UniProtKB/Swiss-Prot annotation:
Protein's name in the database: Uncharacterized hydrolase y4tI
Source organism superkingdom: Bacteria
EC assignment: 3.-.-.-
One Gene Ontology MF term: hydrolase activity
CDD domains in alphabetical order: M20_Acy1
Keyword Nucleus: no
Keyword tags: Hydrolase, Plasmid
PANTHER family: METALLOPEPTIDASE, PUTATIVE (AFU_ORTHOLOGUE AFUA_6G09600)-RELATED, PEPTIDASE M20 FAMILY MEMBER
SUPFAM superfamilies, per the entry: Bacterial exopeptidase dimerisation domain, Zn-dependent exopeptidases
Annotated organism of origin: Sinorhizobium fredii (strain NBRC 101917 / NGR234)
Enzyme class: hydrolase
Stored Pfam families: M20_dimer (PF07687), Peptidase_M20 (PF01546)
Length: 402
């Protein structure tokens, strides 16, 4: 028996047609995954399903995304809550041929569970549309494109002020590190910010036998790689978990030529918003300083990515209550903060937010996200959707997280 069958959540918040739609969308998205900023078929599929259930007037954002507003007509506090389900896939070849809904797109798969996230968001939208006479306030459901790659859909939500007037935002992510049937949420930072940098080191060429006649860009680059890590080990508090990674390094054309140019690219990650600009500044200072020390030059370009996702403590408390009510206290786990990033950080930068995890780990489904063997049982989908419905209802209907 699968662990998911032990859920106390009992399909009471979704009607049969809604449950079927959630599964239908998950399977269709998994069969036809689309990469970031190219989710055109996915967008039309989502719009079609919304309209099939009477939800018309979805608004396009970020070209390939949609959001839908559902207004409640009951008396009560007129709160506004946003829900995010991301929809993009990854450039990975799926190798799980045991799935009846295996990806039909060569080299592309839903290796991060966004097919589940979007389907849960769909279930929330359909349930609240049906129950619109039973709640007060407004629910906005985002089917957000481009979580995985720039330009990021979450940044568009921030820049176009799509959360203006909203009280709370709800996001979620599947994880095989948590057992099926369990849900996790923790207060504070649950992911790192992610900024990208490019360092171009310039020297001058010379014959390999006469290095004194040139300026060796490889030597400068090597010094930078060593020195920049001292920022983490000597300038950042040990419990901050900041990371500076050099991901690519390119330079040199021949074994007997002093290299005149090296290009390096990497990422800067931290959970501390105050450290974020300082780390970028130090990368720049070290690159320029090391280059000057060796009589070369360095040009540094830093591109801001997503901020850290920050969970609001009161929203976490209310979420734990919802899990206990629906699945029992033994279904609760704190979960571990991730070292990666998620553009839901743009949402939590705007308004009090929560980003909770739902477990998918079970025999046969242990592979991590972003791997070709990642898979999640359908069994987790409906219980998680119903929990999301219950939680959003609590936020909207008199269970203020503020």
């Amino acid at each position: 028996m699968r662990a998911a069958m032990n859920f106390r959540i009992n399909n009471s918040l979704l009607i049969e047609a809604e449950r079927d739609a959630v599964l239908e969308l998950r399977h269709a998205m998994h069969r036809e995954p689309e990469l970031s900023n190219n989710e055109w078929k996915t967008q039309q599929r989502i719009r079609g399903m919304l309209e099939r259930f009477g939800l018309k007037g979805a608004t396009v954002f970020h070209n390939t995304g949609l959001y839908i507003d559902i207004e409640g007509s009951a008396s009560g506090p007129k709160r506004a809550v946003a829900v995010r389900g991301d929809i993009d896939a990854l450039p990975i070849q799926e190798t799980r041929d045991d799935l009846p809904y295996q990806s039909h797109v060569e080299g592309v798969m839903h290796a991060c569970g966004h097919d589940l996230h979007a389907s849960i968001a769909m279930g929330v939208a359909l349930a609240f549309h049906r129950m619109r006479n039973n709640f007060a306030g407004k629910l906005r459901v985002f089917f957000q494109p481009a979580e995985e790659a720039e330009p990021l859909g979450g940044r568009t939500v921030l820049e176009e002020r799509l959360l203006e007037g909203f009280d709370n935002a709800v996001g979620f992510h599947v994880t095989p590190s948590i057992q099926v049937g369990k849900f996790g949420a923790r207060e504070g930072a649950v992911s790192k910010s992610s900024d990208q940098f490019k360092v171009t080191v310039s020297g001058s060429a010379a014959h390999g036998s006469t290095p004194h006649n040139g300026i060796d860009a490889i030597t400068i680059a090597a010094a930078f790689v060593n020195e920049v890590q001292k920022v983490i080990s000597r300038e950042v508090p040990v419990d901050d978990r900041s990371v500076i990674t050099i991901g690519t390094i390119h330079g040199g054309e021949a074994t007997n030529i002093i290299c005149p140019k090296v290009v390096m690219e990497g990422t800067i990650r931290t959970t501390n918003p105050e450290l974020r600009p300082l780390l970028s500044q130090r990368v720049r200072e070290i690159a320029e300083g090391v280059a000057a020390l060796h009589r070369g030059k360095a040009e540094v370009v830093v591109t801001s990515g997503e901020p850290a996702v920050i969970n609001d403590p009161e929203m976490v408390r209310l979420f734990r209550d919802a899990v206990s009510d629906m699945a029992g206290s033994d279904a609760l786990t704190q979960g571990k903060a991730i070292s990666g990033s998620d553009d839901f950080g743009f949402y939590s930068q705007c308004i009090p937010s929560i980003y909770f995890w739902f477990g998918s780990g079970e025999p046969g489904n242990e592979s991590g996200v972003h791997t070709p063997t990642f898979a999640v049982s359908d069994d987790v989908l409906i219980p998680t959707t119903e929990l999301a419905v219950k939680y959003c209802f609590d936020l909207l209907h008199g269970q203020s997280a503020r």
